[in-house]
Amino acid sequence: MDINQMTYAVQGALQKAVAYSKEYELQNIEVEALLKAAMNENDSLFKSILERANIDVDQLIKAYDNQLSHYPTVQGDNVQYGQYISAKTNELLDKAEKYMKSYEDEFISMEHILRAAIDTDETTQKWVGNKVEVIKEIITKVRGGNHVTSQNPEVNYEALEKYGRDLVEEVRQGKMDPVIGRDEEIRNTIRILSRKTKNNPVLIGEPGVGKTAIVEGLAQRIVRKDVPESLLDKTIFELDLSALVAGAKYRGEFEERLKAVLKEVKESEGRIILFIDEIHMLVGAGKTDGAMDAGNMLKPMLARGELHCIGATTLNEYREYIEKDSALERRFQKVGVSEPDVEDTISILRGLKERYEVYHGVRIQDRALVAAAELSDRYITDRFLPDKAIDLVDQACATIRTEMGSNPTELDQVNRRVMQLEIEESALKNESDNPSKHRLEELQEELSNEKEKQSSLKSRVEQEKEKIAKVQEKRAELDSSRQALEDAQTEGNLEKAAELQYGTIPQLEKELQKFEEAFQDETGEDSERMIREVVSDEEIGDIVSQWTGIPVSKLVETEREKLLSLSDILHKRVVGQDKAVDLVSDAVVRARAGIKDPNRPIGSFLFLGPTGVGKTELAKSLASSLFDSEKHMIRIDMSEYMEKHAVSRLIGAPPGYVGHDEGGQLTEAVRRNPYSVILLDEVEKAHSDVFNVLLQILDEGRLTDSKGRSVDFKNTIIIMTSNIGSQVLLENVKDAGEISDDTEKAVMDSLHAYFKPEILNRMDDIVLFKPLSVNDMSMIVDKILTQLNMRLLDQHISIEVTEEAKKWLGEEAYEPQFGARPLKRFVQRQIETPIARMMIKESLPEGTIIKVDLNDNKELDFKVVKPTS
């Protein structure tokens, strides 16, 4: 028999049969080896048909194995297993060839092998029994009137089921979420589908606005019979393009698969509507040398009206792929899908609420849905409603569900504490010194208390979990009853529908309410429970904060205190600049209270003053206070932007230039951390054209980068520092450190000479930093010495400096034109260097105190006080 007269699947089965012959040490390829191989082929048609006939294929494979183990084996060094085809196998293949001819096929396929096995193999006959006619019917249905004209015929069998999914059937089975709104777009789609020619709508809109949902909504309307008569008998198949392309090994196989799909659609005589999501992928799909792409294969059928098709794609991809192919474009009718507003999104979320409650086993408050729509619209700017709002709700539900499945935080902390104490206890038991024994007694008492607390908490958690499970069970039961009601109404089973609507469902609703009320009474308010099962607006705010880094969740007590004392915290780090500190801290408080202008940055300030007076330090202090780290400050040194072309480094190189893919230093940093302090240091050093980029940031709180993406600056604090007018400030400052009106006017004149009015007009405030006074210097000395003590803490050494020595340090290092920086250098020389020499010269024990005083010669004396043992 010619192996080339067999399909690839049968050839593969023969090769596998050789391997099975080797496994069982058989010289011949027996029937059972071939049939077992046919069962184990990838996407085996042989196995699929038997499974549909409800035959236990696993047991049948075991029966084949059992038969193979009874054949006589051949052993030896040069034995070639599976070298010959046995007489029974030959008989089976001859029979398969006869079936091939009777089906008018060109190649022996798997269904021929199956029919031949039923006729010739006793084991197969035994397991098939009286299901021969059933198997024949299944084969006829699978073939669908096709003939085997290629060596890969399986791609043509039930192509739609293989490469698509029936949306109408999924709606009937209750697998689809409800579609809320979008009535106008669905009506437009129905109108286009009802046309005689060019009845192929293409849904165009941004990602996440609900294009696929419109098609799902149409499928739901077909099930509810809420469509014109011409669409009542229609079904919608979603084509999976990736499945069509995947595994197409041979030249022309992709086209063959697509042709089989289109043939089934054509033979349905308009009953099947094909939905192709991401339809732009058709253009160029499967195109190789000399091959035709999928888009060109669709055109003739679309033009003749033989193919009813709905496409969906985004605006950019439609422009890039479909519009270029004008012949394909004119065969589709565009349906624009715009982003819904916040109110419509809230309606959509309310419609989905019940499905998410049942799926996650939680309760979603209405204010959580409102918060999801509003917060996602305001803070998640690079995505679209309703997708981003639905994602927020889903994530919040998943968070609560995860918490419900694991130990509550309170119990988890107690468990960890118990474990920690037990480890410490076992370590201390090995020690014999008195402090260790004393600590062991204290520890054992604490451990006993913690274990008691642990037991009590565990008991509460178990009780609450049990009650929540009952509520969840009742919710799921209610949901399945509602689905059954829809099915009964669709099928016209009015008796069942009436029983469900007026009997079962009201009863379940009452029971659910009773369970929830009992749960509420027994466990108290939501805030008192160990296990949270409610999704509120706080959870939504937490998720937004996680995704964006912007604090939108409700203020906790510690954060309230932190914000109210922000001004005091900044005053400790920045000395002598009260006005600047108050302006910045007030801007942060306004933003966190939610009353700032939502379309502008939190605050934009220009700090003017001499070098070393605390301009940059204030920006660092603010970042450190808000984020507990100076790393959250985006620092741009404007001295690097002295050339006109350097502005491209802020927003990214234009298309075609090197570095276009990398993005801009400023825009990329803000995209990653939307809530941050931006410090533009030494702005006067930059080229004047660089400031034109800042215009829309300061006014609208946004900036478009080189890739056309809008970057949101509404949650940033922008601080610019400059030394413009510092000479005027130094020369005209009053003894008390106050700045006169004339001095301020002179500084402003210098500023106007450098900056354009449109830049200055957009800033919230221009703050003049006054030169530091001698009194300020003594406070800065305290700060520097505190930092030094912090560094010495690791070595358990501390320094004490007398007031007289501090005063001398401040006076000696005082240089008004240089600010605080000379003082830092002076302290390094006078205190840090001598202490470092002492530490290296003699090993100072832990607890050493170094006392620093001023002697009569105006020099510093260092006295080492070692701890008494």
From Swiss-Prot:
Description of how the protein assembles with itself and partners: Homohexamer. The oligomerization is ATP-dependent.
Single annotated GO MF: ATP hydrolysis activity
PROSITE patterns linked: CLP_R, CLPAB_1, CLPAB_2
NCBIfam families, A to Z: chaperone_ClpB
Stretch list, region NBD1: 158-339
Region (Repeat 2): 85-145
Region (NBD2): 559-771
Region listing for Repeat 1, in residue ranges: 6-71
Similarity comment text for this entry: Belongs to the ClpA/ClpB family.
Gene that this polypeptide is encoded by: clpB
Principal cellular location given in the protein's record: cytoplasm
Coiled-coil region list: 390-524
Name of the protein described by the UniProt record: Chaperone protein ClpB
Domain notes: The Clp repeat (R) domain probably functions as a substrate-discriminating domain, recruiting aggregated proteins to the ClpB hexamer and/or stabilizing bound proteins. The NBD2 domain is responsible for oligomerization, whereas the NBD1 domain stabilizes the hexamer probably in an ATP-dependent manner. The movement of the coiled-coil domain is essential for ClpB ability to rescue proteins from an aggregated state, probably by pulling apart large aggregated proteins, which are bound between the coiled-coils motifs of adjacent ClpB subunits in the functional hexamer.
Record-listed ATP 1 binding positions: 205-212
Alphabetical keyword list: ATP-binding, Chaperone, Coiled coil, Cytoplasm, Nucleotide-binding, Repeat, Stress response
A GO cellular component annotation in the UniProt record: cytoplasm
UniProt organism field: Staphylococcus epidermidis (strain ATCC 35984 / DSM 28319 / BCRC 17069 / CCUG 31568 / BM 3577 / RP62A)
Region (C-terminal): 772-869
Protein's job: Part of a stress-induced multi-chaperone system, it is involved in the recovery of the cell from heat-induced damage, in cooperation with DnaK, DnaJ and GrpE. Acts before DnaK, in the processing of protein aggregates. Protein binding stimulates the ATPase activity; ATP hydrolysis unfolds the denatured protein aggregates, which probably helps expose new hydrophobic binding sites on the surface of ClpB-bound aggregates, contributing to the solubilization and refolding of denatured protein aggregates by DnaK.
Residue span of region Disordered: 443-465
